[in-house]
């Protein structure tokens, strides 16, 4: 277990995670119209939220973990004071152009059908969900017994769960896209093809229809 502060310092100090975050933020900010509101779903300690607010986007943050939320309130104190960042107890408390979920937030949910159903009234038509999920095809994980044991499940079902305290679920992109319909349509996947063998995270852009 870790505290919010420990997680915050680790994420800021990890070159790999900083690079992943930079790519995710660049993609999100490039997709958002000027001044558009965004919900940071599973906002963690508010690192992304602070960046969105700095670029002029009213940012709502939903974070169920108390330790993370406490750190977020400290990290985004100035933004919260001027209402550039607003904490919400439920995603349904806002209506936005985009929902972002960075660093495997969606991997904590077994039922993506229910998740996208919940998010559908939050995102305006034409808006989007941008999610960073753990890549089930990453060959760097092949050294782990659980990856090899679940490879057949991935091929057959497109989904498996890792036995652990956090019960992380891994999904093939097609399974996420199927769960998102009919509310969202998969518009972009990065990386694609052979690139999926080398990246720990995959970015899915799902458009509200």
Residue ranges and their predicted role:
Residues 1-32, 35-44, 51, 130-155, 199:
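Conserved class I S-adenosyl-L-methionine
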Residues 98-112:
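A short SAM/SAH-binding and catalytic strip from SAM-dependent methyltransferases
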Residues 113-125:
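A short glycine-rich, Lys/Arg-flanked "PGG" loop and its adjoining helix->strand segment in the class I
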Residues 164-184:
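Short alpha-helix
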Residues 45-82, 86-87:
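Class I SAM-dependent methyltransferase SAM/SAH-binding core
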């Amino acid at each position: 277990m870790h505290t919010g502060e420990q997680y915050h310092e680790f994420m800021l100090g990890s070159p790999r995670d900083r690079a992943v975050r930079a790519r995710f933020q660049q993609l999100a900010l490039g997709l958002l119209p000027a001044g558009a509101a965004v919900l940071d779903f599973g906002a963690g300690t508010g690192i992304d939220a602070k960046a969105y607010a700095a670029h002029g986007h009213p940012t709502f943050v939903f974070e169920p973990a108390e330790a993370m939320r406490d750190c977020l309130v400290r990290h985004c104190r100035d933004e919260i004071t001027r209402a550039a960042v607003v904490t919400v107890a439920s995603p349904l408390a806002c209506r936005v152009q985009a929902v972002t979920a960075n660093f495997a937030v969606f991997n904590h949910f077994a039922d993506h059908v229910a998740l996208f159903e919940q998010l559908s009234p939050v995102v305006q038509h034409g808006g989007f969900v941008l999610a960073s999920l753990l890549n089930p095809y990453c060959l760097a994980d092949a050294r782990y017994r659980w990856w090899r044991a679940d490879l057949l499940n991935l091929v057959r079902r497109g989904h498996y769960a890792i036995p652990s305290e956090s019960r992380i679920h891994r999904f093939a992109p097609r399974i996420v896209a199927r769960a998102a319909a009919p509310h969202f349509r998969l518009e972009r996947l990065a990386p694609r093809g052979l690139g999926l063998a080398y990246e720990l995270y995959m970015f899915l852009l799902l458009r509200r229809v």
